[in-house]
A protein has these predicted regions:
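Class II aminoacyl-tRNA synthetase-like tRNA-binding/catalytic domains
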Residues: 1-131, 142-143, 205-219, 228-230, ...
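Amphipathic alpha-helical segments
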Residues: 29-44, 140, 153-169, 298-302
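Extended C-terminal subregions enriched in glycine
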Residues: 151-155, 160-190
């Protein structure tokens, strides 16, 4: 079953500022992207071409022409944002690749160029310090006619990207690794991770990019002969890359309107923390139709939608417990007027504005808006006055 975006949801998605686009003003993300692109231009001594494409794409370009199977879970409306049976908001910047490959069909001679496809992608995602519903990505594809590209080229591409994102001069001792990874549009696919130190001192591997050799079927579907054409493909999340480079621990800061924070997002210097307002927590007891609805990505997406322009106040949404009717005390079932198949979900909201203090009353009103959007039960428990 497909859930299509309403016109309001679509307009609000399309109105969101793309931080990779200089047309809306300077942002650190553009500087980081420029560093990565120029590093690869130097590595290979080839020109680059940047494509800023409409985020509304043919579903076939987002999935089928990149080799995704018809039953792939990522197609589900629970995770992707469909506008109609054949059109969606792209879930990755790779959606622009099939049309790009089509445009190369007439190239007869030598060809070697880096294609850069940056922009917003649209997901339904969890709410926490590292996830938003519309993150930024870039696809970096080197396409070459009359020449081979192999795993050694991919390895040097990964090394150049790591050095561009986390230059050794500022990040001495940076460690990275690549592990095998399967993508429908690459062969010899790799996942690129960097080792980061968390605020509590622990080390953790974080994914920076996914990459691989361009798969022959993807070339073939655009009429390019894989015996003549070869390619390297790398996709990177730019929000995470900027956060790693600048030492930012909350993804919401990248869009902050707070002048103290905003001024620090014009360069790639290390972020100097600005004291944030205290976090306010609100716990909700929801009745949902079944346990499949108790999905942190699904609930996070609905909560963001309910809050609209206030969504940036929601720092985290956590599921604390999921209990079927049969396991609840009869008094609770009675009070909530639950049906046999229902589940009770205890949900915690963490509300923390980046630029103002939240009164209890304001927090209660935000809590109620989320509650009304998520709760499926017969009895409502609202707390705002």
């Amino acid at each position: 079953v497909k859930n299509y975006l309403s016109l309001t949801e679509l307009n609000s998605a399309l109105a969101l500022r793309d931080l990779t686009d200089p047309a809306a003003g300077t942002h650190a993300m553009q500087l980081l992207l420029a560093d990565a692109v120029s590093a690869l231009e130097r590595l290979w001594d080839i020109p680059s071409e940047t494509h800023r494409l409409n985020p509304l794409v043919a579903t076939a370009d987002n999935y089928d022409r990149l080799g995704y199977s018809p039953g792939d879970v990522t197609r589900d409306s629970r995770y992707s944002r469909h506008v109609s049976p054949t059109v969606m908001l792209r879930s990755h910047t790779s959606a622009g690749i099939p049309a790009l490959l089509d445009s190369l069909r007439g190239e007869q001679g030598l060809y070697d160029r880096l294609h850069v496809l940056p922009g917003l992608v649209y997901r339904r995602d969890a709410v926490d310090r590292t996830h938003v519903g519309a993150p930024h990505q870039v696809d970096l594809w080197r396409l070459k006619a009359r020449g081979l590209l192999g795993p050694a080229d991919l390895q040097s591409m990964m090394a150049a990207v790591v050095e561009a994102v986390l230059p050794a001069a500022d990040h001495p001792g940076v460690q990275w690794r690549s592990t095998p990874s399967t993508h429908s549009y690459t062969a010899a696919g790799r996942q690129l991770d960097v080792l980061v130190t968390l605020p509590d001192g622990r080390n953790e591997w974080l994914e920076l990019a996914e990459c691989g050799l361009v798969a022959a079927p993807v070339l073939r579907s655009s009429g390019l002969d894989p015996r003549r054409w070869a390619g390297l493909a790398l996709g990177m999340g730019l929000d995470r890359a900027v956060m790693l480079r600048k030492g930012i621990d909350d993804i919401r800061l990248l869009r902050s309107e707070n002048p103290e924070i905003r001024a620090q997002l014009l360069d790639l210097a290390r972020y100097r923390p600005v004291s944030l307002m205290p976090a306010v927590r609100r716990d909700l007891s929801l009745v949902l139709a079944d346990s499949a609805e108790a999905d942190v990505e699904l609930l996070g997406d609905r909560a963001r939608g309910a809050l609209g322009t206030d969504a940036d106040v929601l720092a985290a949404l956590e599921i604390k417990a999921v209990t079927p009717t049969a396991e609840l005390p009869p008094a609770a079932v009675d009070r909530l007027r639950m049906d046999p198949g229902d589940v009770n979900v205890l949900l915690r909201l963490v509300l923390q504005p980046l630029d103002r203090t939240l009164t209890d009353e304001q927090a209660n009103r935000l809590r109620d808006r989320v509650y009304v959007a998520l709760h499926r039960g017969k009895v409502q428990e609202l707390i705002a006055g």
